[in-house]
Curated annotation (Swiss-Prot):
Keywords: ATP-binding, Hydrolase, Magnesium, Membrane, Nucleotide-binding, Transmembrane, Transmembrane helix. This is AAA-ATPase At2g18190. CDD domains: RecA-like_BCS1. It is a single-pass membrane protein.
Length: 494
C-alpha cells in the first residue's frame, strides 16, 4: 500500500517539494492557531510546550544581596569574609585593601570571579556580581551561590550557618584585642563603649604562653581549662550555671600575673576590662559598670587584697554603714553577687580574674569553693621557667651554654622572680657575660635570703628570751609579795 523507504526518491527537487509543503502547512496551522484559538488557551498551550521541551536544570542558584531593605545582609558580609580563606591559585583577579589601623592586608574577589567550595563532600560555587541599579544609579553587589537542587536543605540548615560561624571566627582572629579602662579617654574606636564610661587602647602586649616563664605543666593546665570552657556553652546551660570562669592569681610581685592575663587575652582574643574598685562609690554604680562590659571579655580586678580596703564588710547593715560613714559604698557582698550570685548570669563567655600578692589577707568569702574556679599560684621562678627566659632573651644558643645547668640548680634552691631574672638577662649582649652576671646575682640573692632568715631567727629567739625573763621576773615579784604578806601576818599574830 505504502512505498518502501528504499523506493522513495531523495533527489534535491523532491526534498525541496516536501520542505515547501511542510512549510505551507505550518504557516496555515499558525494562522488558524492565532485566529481561532482563544488567547488564554494559546498562552496555556505555549507555556506547556515550553516546559516540556526546555531541558530541566539540576542546579539551584541563590542570590545573596548586599542590602536587604535599608540594612546590610549578614549573610553577604559573612560570605565576604569567609571567601577570603577560600581563594585559590585559579582565581585570576583580586581586590586588595588596608585601613590605617589594620595589621594585615584584606583580600576580596573581583567582579565575575568564581570560587569553588566543598562542604561535607558536596561542591558549591560562589560568584561575585556587580550590576548597575538603574533606579538609584548605584552598583548593586551580590553573590550567587550555585549548587545541586538536592542540596537545598543542607545549604539552608547547615552550610550557611557554617559560613557565618567561620566568618565570625576569622574576624575575631584578625580583630585587635582592646584594653578598656575608665581612666582612658573615650574615642571613636571604643566600639560603642564610650557611653558606659569605658575608654580603650589596643592591647599590644607581646606576652604569649610560649614566652611566659612558667612551668610547662602549669601553662598546659591553664590552656586546657580555657579551651574546655569555650566548648562548654551547652554544658553550662544544661547544668544551670552562668557561662563564665573565674581565676585567682596569687604570688609575690614580679612573678608574671599581669603577663599571664595578657597571654590569656592574646590566646582567646578576648578584650580586657581593667576595673579599679577605688573609683567606684556604691553597689549601684558597680552594677551599672559591670553590665556595660561585653561578651568574650576578661574582667580584671588587680590587687584585690588592697582593694578590700575600699570594700565594706559584707555583714554590716545599712545603719552601721551610715554610722561609720560608709553608707552607699561598695560592699563585698555586692561584688560577690557578680562573681557567682544572681547577677553573675549576665552575658556569655566571661572570664573574671582577681590578682593578689597576699592570698592569706583575702576575705574567706573570696576563697570559698566554687567562687573562683581556679587558683593559680604564681610562684618564684623555677629552672624550667628560666630556660624559657633564656630562649626569649638569648635565643636557642643560650640554652646550650654550660652555665645554664648551674643557674637552674641555683634558682631551684632560692627565691628569685622572673622579672628580676629578665632584668639581668637584658644587661649585656654577650651571652657569656650575661650568664655570669646571672650566676653572681642568684648567689648574692641566696646569701641575702640566708642572712634575712638568720636575723629573723635571732630576733624570734631574743623575743622568746625576753618573754621568759619577763615571766621569771613576774614570778619572783609574786613570791616576794607573798613573803611580805606572810611576814606581816606573823607580826600581827605576835
Amino acid at each position: 500500500m505504502f512505498p518502501s523507504i528504499s523506493n522513495i526518491s531523495l533527489s534535491p527537487s523532491s526534498l525541496f517539494t516536501a520542505y515547501a509543503s511542510l512549510t505551507g502547512f505550518l504557516m496555515l496551522f499558525r494562522s488558524l492557531f492565532n485566529d481561532e484559538v482563544p488567547e488564554r488557551l494559546r498562552s496555556y498551550i505555549t507555556d506547556l510546550l515550553n516546559r516540556f521541551f526546555t531541558p530541566k536544570s539540576k542546579n539551584l542558584t541563590m542570590v545573596i544581596d548586599e542590602i536587604i531593605g535599608f540594612k546590610r545582609n549578614q549573610v553577604f558580609d559573612a560570605a565576604e569574609v569567609y571567601l577570603r580563606n577560600k581563594i585559590g591559585p585559579e582565581t585570576a583577579r583580586l581586590r586588595v585593601g588596608k585601613l590605617p589601623k589594620q595589621k594585615h592586608f584584606t583580600i576580596y574577589i573581583e567582579k565575575g570571579e568564581e570560587i569553588l567550595d566543598t562542604f561535607e563532600n558536596s561542591e558549591l560555587r560562589w560568584t561575585y556580581v556587580e550590576s548597575e541599579n538603574e533606579a538609584s544609579q548605584k552598583e548593586k553587589r551580590y553573590y550567587e551561590l550555585t549548587f545541586e537542587k538536592k542540596l537545598r536543605d543542607k545549604v539552608m540548615n547547615s552550610y550557611l550557618s557554617h559560613v557565618v560561624a567561620e566568618s565570625e571566627e576569622t574576624k575575631r582572629d584578625l580583630r585587635a584585642v582592646k584594653l578598656y579602662s575608665r581612666d582612658v579617654r573615650a574615642s571613636k574606636d571604643d566600639d560603642g563603649m564610650a557611653g558606659a564610661g569605658w575608654g580603650c587602647i589596643n592591647l599590644e602586649h607581646p606576652s604569649t604562653f610560649e614566652t611566659l616563664a612558667m612551668d610547662p605543666g602549669a601553662k598546659k593546665k591553664i590552656i586546657d581549662d580555657m579551651e574546655r570552657f569555650l566548648k562548654r556553652r551547652e554544658f553550662y546551660k544544661r547544668v544551670g550555671k552562668a557561662w563564665k570562669r573565674g581565676y585567682l592569681l596569687y604570688g609575690p610581685p614580679g612573678t608574671g600575673k599581669s603577663s599571664l592575663i595578657a597571654a590569656m587575652a592574646n590566646y582567646l582574643k578576648f578584650d580586657v576590662f581593667d576595673l579599679e574598685l577605688s573609683s567606684i562609690y556604691e553597689n549601684a554604680q558597680l552594677k551599672s559598670i559591670l553590665l556595660s562590659t561585653t561578651n568574650r571579655s576578661i574582667l580584671v580586678i588587680e590587687d584585690i587584697d588592697c582593694s578590700s580596703a575600699e570594700v565594706v564588710d559584707r555583714e554590716a547593715d545599712e545603719y552601721q554603714e551610715y554610722e561609720e560613714g560608709y553608707y552607699g559604698r561598695v560592699t563585698l557582698s555586692g561584688l560577690l553577687n557578680f562573681v557567682d550570685g544572681l547577677w553573675s548570669s549576665f552575658g556569655d563567655e566571661r572570664i573574671i580574674v582577681f590578682t593578689t600578692n597576699h592570698k592569706e589577707r583575702l576575705d574567706p568569702a573570696l576563697l570559698r569553693p566554687g567562687r573562683m574556679d581556679m587558683h593559680i599560684n604564681m610562684s618564684y621562678c623555677t629552672g624550667l621557667g628560666f630556660r624559657t627566659l633564656v630562649s626569649n632573651y638569648l635565643g636557642l644558643g643560650g640554652l646550650n651554654h654550660p652555665l645554664c645547668e648551674e643557674i637552674e640548680a641555683l634558682i631551684d634552691s632560692t627565691e628569685v622572680t622572673p622579672a628580676e631574672l629578665a632584668e639581668e638577662l637584658m644587661q649585656e649582649d654577650d651571652t657569656d657575660v650575661v650568664l655570669r652576671g646571672v650566676v653572681s646575682f642568684v648567689e648574692n640573692r641566696k646569701v641575702e635570703i640566708s642572712k634575712t632568715k638568720e636575723l629573723e631567727g635571732s630576733t624570734c629567739r631574743k623575743l622568746d628570751g625576753d618573754d621568759k625573763h619577763n615571766v621569771s621576773s613576774t614570778n619572783d615579784l609574786k613570791k616576794t609579795k607573798k613573803k611580805k604578806k606572810g611576814g606581816k601576818g606573823k607580826a600581827k599574830g605576835n
